UniProtKB/Swiss-Prot annotation:
E.C. code: 6.3.1.5
Top-level taxon: Bacteria
Gene3D superfamilies given in the database record: HUPs (3.40.50.620)
Residues the record lists as binding ATP: 46-53, 159, 188, 210
Name of the molecule in the record: NH(3)-dependent NAD(+) synthetase
Positions bound to Mg(2+): 52, 164
EC category: ligase
NCBIfam families in alphabetical order: nadE (TIGR00552), PRK00768.1 (NF001979)
Cystines in this chain: none
Function noted in UniProt: Catalyzes the ATP-dependent amidation of deamido-NAD to form NAD. Uses ammonia as a nitrogen source.
Record keywords: ATP-binding, Ligase, Magnesium, Metal-binding, NAD, Nucleotide-binding
Amino acid sequence: MTLQETIIAQLGVKPSINPKEEIRKSVDFLKAYMIKHPFLKTYVLGISGGQDSTLAGRLAQLAVEELRAETEKDYQFIAIRLPYGVQADEDDAQRALAFIKPDVSLTINIKEAVDGQVAELAKAGVNVSDFNKGNIKARQRMITQYAVAGENSGAVIGTDHAAENLTGFFTKFGDGGADILPLFRLNKRQGAALLAELGADKALYEKVPTADLEEDKPGIADEVALGVTYHEIDDYLEGKEVSAKAQETIETWWRKGQHKRHLPITIFDDFWK
């Protein structure tokens, strides 16, 4: 088995999908998890305005609406805006919220918490790089989501999908930390197909993807940071042939990000050797 075949098998990616069927699978998955854990009453997710959180948010809202109708219990979806100061693409985030139609929408600005942490580190002689500060932002957002979930008998939804997981393009214990991943198995173009099926505005899934965590490189596109396009990543995940350069880049990211796909390493683990 080639590395490409191994990765595809591990991430469960299909070469083609039926968007309607995949929507049903994700909604049913979210419903089943909540029913199995009767102490859960809410799902919580941070909404950035990008494709992934927009899709996961809409799926979550559909799931709790169906659960309310079927059980007469007051399940809720809580969407959280988590800007650092003023978000440049706030209009996109508001467009996403209008599409998702969450039961509850909160806005919690993380700037003061992040800047306070960076300032305290500086007092201790630790000068945080812009890149590391970006990771602090991602982790602060997840701290906030878990705080909201903890006060509302909730589970935190993650937006990790196959293209992101393959490249390790997420912050460990930041946006990579969550309870449930309804998009896992889908690549980027498949996620866009689900949003199209759900009737989303094209702007919500044709927008250039960016993590937008670094202040020295505001709005830097994921594809620029990765050195490979999502089209190439998606082709790779669908078992198609890509250029030698793209394959090398993709597989380098896979190896480099292995530690992000595991729980903390124990003496019994050998994947890292």
